[in-house]
């Protein structure tokens, strides 16, 4: 099972049992797309993991130990401002979608009550963790900012009004009426893919298991499936909130199940991400150095004119009395080659200043050679 709406339904019940009325004591962000809230509830400390990871997105209690960054970023500082010390008032799933809302109350700097909602959207690469002002519906902060150019349907930026993800029109399998459900079960194709289209929040594994159950009394079987008590279990390739036909190992809670299932997978993914980031940085540095080398080679080539500038300065100094004041060039005897040489002049400068100009060019290129070859 993926972390679908069906699984989140059962997880929401688990979180309510453990966290309602609890107080948020600490907020940390151990990884870029993950938030960990330390909550004191029922005389126990719990760690609530909220993940907006594109592959491993989920919400769960965890016993995993995380290392936190030494310097908090803007996102985590805003989260701490609004959530530290807050009391959890409500935890609810939106329909049977992969969206969880955690409503909390807190006090601001002057003692006034502040109500905010933490929205966790588990939607693959579009997963997000968003903090809302409850009264206005405005976004305070989000772990992923989404501008209009990225999504024309809704922007996820501080100050924007929160707009929920678009609805597909599918039915909530937990609340659909008997009459409508009976009609669907006796007129529709009940293959897994079709069940996913009709009913909200069914992953492929859940839909496959449900399809296999719908045999004789379909209405009764359907209701029993969605009323089944939670039985966290590992399957051949994944995990489930119920005992599925391919279940292998049972665990005591859904959170323990996810800790067991994701521990090695998430760690490997983080290592791969860090390796990819390191490779990207090395490649960027190599590209910068290649460009720098090309530029230095061009500059080094230009320094080959240094000796020519020195000789022109020497010739102008030697034959200073032959250099006119108002001309843009002068022809002199070049005692270095035994031939005539034409030297360009700046008419705005005196003969001596023109000579010094060539010496300055020579010195500049000479220093450049030292720098490039050091």
Residue ranges and their predicted role:
Residues 1-374:
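Extended, highly charged segments
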């Amino acid at each position: 099972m993926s972390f679908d709406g069906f699984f989140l339904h059962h997880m929401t019940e688990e979180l309510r049992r453990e966290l309602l009325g609890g107080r948020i004591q600490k907020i940390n962000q151990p990884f870029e797309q993950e938030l960990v809230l330390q909550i004191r509830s029922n005389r126990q400390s719990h760690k609530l993991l909220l993940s907006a990871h594109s592959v491993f997105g989920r919400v769960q209690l965890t016993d995993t130990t995380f290392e936190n960054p030494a310097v908090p970023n803007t996102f985590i500082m805003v989260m701490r401002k609004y959530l530290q010390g807050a009391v959890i008032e409500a935890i609810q799933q939106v329909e049977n979608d992969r969206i969880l809302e955690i409503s909390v109350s807190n006090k601001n700097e002057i003692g006034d009550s502040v109500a905010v909602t933490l929205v966790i959207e588990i939607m693959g690469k579009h997963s997000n963790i968003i903090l809302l002002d409850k009264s206005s519906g405005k976004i305070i902060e989000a772990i992923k900012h989404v501008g209009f150019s990225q999504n024309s349907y809704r922007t996820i930026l501080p100050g924007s009004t929160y707009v929920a993800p678009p609805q597909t029109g599918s039915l909530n399998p937990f609340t659909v009426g008997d009459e409508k459900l009976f009609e669907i079960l006796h007129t529709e194709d009940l293959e897994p893919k079709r069940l996913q289209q009709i009913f909200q929040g069914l992953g492929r594994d859940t839909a496959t298991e449900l399809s296999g159950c719908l045999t004789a009394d379909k209405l009764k079987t359907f209701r029993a499936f969605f009323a089944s008590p939670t039985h966290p279990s590992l399957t051949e390739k994944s995990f489930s909130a119920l005992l599925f036909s391919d279940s292998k190992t049972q665990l005591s809670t859904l959170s323990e199940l996810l800790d067991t299932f994701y521990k090695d997978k998430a760690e490997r993914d983080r290592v791969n991400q860090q390796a990819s980031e390191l490779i990207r940085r090395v490649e960027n540095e190599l590209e910068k150095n290649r460009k720098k080398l090309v530029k230095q080679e061009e500059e080094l080539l230009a320094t080959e004119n240094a000796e020519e500038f020195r000789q022109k300065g020497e010739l102008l100094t030697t034959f200073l009395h032959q250099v006119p004041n108002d001309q843009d060039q002068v022809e002199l005897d070049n005692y270095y080659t035994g031939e005539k040489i034409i030297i360009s002049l700046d008419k705005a400068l005196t003969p001596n200043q023109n000579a010094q100009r060539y010496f300055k060019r020579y010195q500049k290129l000479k220093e450049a050679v030292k720098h490039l070859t050091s």
